[in-house]
Curated annotation (Swiss-Prot):
Gene3D superfamilies on file: Endonuclease/exonuclease/phosphatase
Descriptive protein name: Type I inositol polyphosphate 5-phosphatase 8
GO biological process terms on file: phosphatidylinositol dephosphorylation
The enzyme's E.C. designation: 3.1.3.-
Annotated source species: Arabidopsis thaliana
Family: Belongs to the inositol polyphosphate 5-phosphatase family.
Coiled coil: none
Organism lineage string: Eukaryota, Viridiplantae, Streptophyta, Embryophyta, Tracheophyta
Region feature (Catalytic 1): 300-315
Top-level lineage group: Eukaryota
Span list, region Catalytic 2: 379-394
InterPro entries: Endo/exonu/phosph_ase_sf (IPR036691), IP5P_plant (IPR045849), IPPc (IPR000300)
GO MF terms held by the record: inositol-polyphosphate 5-phosphatase activity
Length: 479
């Protein structure tokens, strides 16, 4: 009886420790790029999986990249550079990828991209163990491996590049086989292709940025920021992972989000509040004299991607329009577009024209949507465009906005291709852009939604108690 009481009283401390652990590791990220001036960091759950001397894990440093000696300075011949940027988002429904999963359908593009920005939601199941316990980065490692293989497929290389790749390849390492003192070799001259600039995970949200190798030395100021908007408004089952970086003299920010779910009336207000809080709480560390971007809106160009979870406003003709594939009429009921037109969120942001079918909710391994019937016990799910890509900033043009057809999860992936103008010369007269005023929270909205969210999340925690009781590692860590 004493053990049961102890277990039931331990979950608040477990939640607090989880929150503190997220905060202590908030500025760590994974990268192929070595960084100098790395600041010492407090140990977190990642240290139990990857040894401290693993050169891929980066603490938040001064953002300056270490280049190997002998690299020649590239002459700048123009003020601007035109690049292609591929952006993809995919809610994978808590499923870990199987070996050999083909990502070609998702990563295909009408033109080769210089930068790939890939965001995931639910890379792990959003159960009590993953939300409150140590982070499971096994699925993230698998996704990175598959992406690396797809982007650097030797079938797409020229004979010279192929020979260089063969001579430069290093043996693969398994995280599960690492001990605390296992040395991991770092190849100082990677083959031509794509390298991981940065990746960051927060529970089920995972964001990674890949850059063409010949642009690698022009990437600086890599930083990350996480905002939890899940349980109690701070845990990471919902929220955002953001990556900030500079390419030449242009600052870029990528925000991968998984917003509050639900299609009851008023749930869109909770999603609006998530967006407001993400703008408010996303911060990239910098010194007091540093002019580098600190907030999302300080950047020159911003991409916002993810499962935004906005649904279709209920109406009598909704299902008829779905049957007729009348996407134009259905999009008039899209909550994201309604809220944006009203100026409540994403004022001044752009999204491409949607010509594809709703991306959620599908039956697994099927082309059929989940539709509730009288005998069905499933939650009511009206198909919707939950998965979106938006952008803000001058010098960006969307060339392509489509969905993939992978049946891996209950969401269809979405992808886009952008043409991006990059400044090659320092714009010394450029001033920091203020955060848009429309993202300040409405006091009444904040108070109403906060009370509703708190009540529902306390109920969720209570129901999750039976799950927590079965997790010895959580109980022992909290005792």
């Amino acid at each position: 009886m004493g053990k049961i009481l102890k277990s039931k009283s331990s979950w608040p401390r477990t939640v607090v420790r989880k929150w503190l652990n997220l905060r202590s590791g908030a500025y760590e990220f994974h990268s192929d790029y070595p960084v100098k001036g790395m600041e010492p960091r407090r140990k977190s759950c990642s240290d139990m999986i990857v040894p401290e001397n693993f050169q891929g894990w980066l603490g938040q440093g001064n953002g300056d990249l270490k280049h190997s000696t002998g690299e020649q300075h590239v002459t700048r011949v123009d003020d601007k550079l035109d690049l292609k940027m591929f952006v993809g988002t995919w809610n994978v429904g808590g499923k870990s990828p199987h070996e050999g999963l083909d990502l070609k359908d998702w990563l295909k593009s009408p033109a080769d991209a210089d930068i790939y920005v890939l965001g995931f939601q639910e890379i792990v199941p959003l159960n009590a163990g993953n939300v409150l316990g140590a982070e499971d980065n096994g699925p993230a490692a698998k996704w990175l491996s598959l992406i690396r293989e797809a982007l650097n497929n030797t079938n797409n290389l020229s004979p010279n590049e192929l020979e260089h790749t063969k001579s430069s390849q290093q043996p693969r390492f398994s995280f599960s086989g690492l001990s605390d003192d296992t040395p991991i070799p770092c190849n100082s001259t990677p083959p031509r292709g794509y390298s991981l600039a940065a990746s960051k995970q927060m529970v089920g949200i995972f964001l990674c940025v890949w850059v063409r190798d010949d642009l690698r030395k022009r990437i600086t100021n890599l930083k990350v920021s996480c905002v939890g908007r899940g349980i109690m408004g701070y845990l990471g089952n919902k929220g955002s992972v953001s990556i900030s970086m500079s390419l030449h003299e242009t600052s870029l920010c990528f925000v991968c989000t998984h917003l509050t779910s639900g299609e009851k009336e008023g749930d869109e207000l909770r999603r609006n509040l998530d967006v407001t809080e993400i703008f408010k709480r996303t911060r990239f560390s910098r010194s007091s004299k540093d002019s580098r971007p600190e907030t999302i809106m300080d950047h020159d160009k911003v991409i916002w991607l993810g499962d935004l979870n906005y649904r279709l406003r209920a109406s009598s003709d909704l299902h008829e329009q779905l049957r007729n594939h009348d996407w134009e009429s259905l999009l008039e009921k899209d909550q994201l577009k309604i809220e944006q037109r009203a100026g409540r969120i994403f004022k001044g942001w752009e999204e491409g024209k949607i010509y594809f079918a709703p991306t959620y909710k599908y039956r697994i391994n099927s082309d059929n949507y989940v539709v509730q019937t009288e005998k069905s016990k499933e939650k009511r799910r009206t198909p919707a465009w939950c998965d979106r890509i938006l952008w803000k900033g001058d010098g960006m043009k969307q060339l392509w906005y489509v969905r993939g057809e992978s049946k891996f999860s209950d969401h269809r992936p979405v992808q886009s291709l952008f043409s991006v103008h990059i400044d090659l010369k320092n714009q010394s007269n450029r001033k920091t852009k203020p955060v848009n005023q429309n993202h300040r929270p409405n006091p009444v909205l904040t108070y109403t939604c906060h009370g509703k969210v708190q009540a529902e999340e306390i109920l969720l925690l209570t129901r999750a108690q039976s799950c927590i009781d079965t997790l010895p590692r959580l109980i022992s860590s909290a005792s």
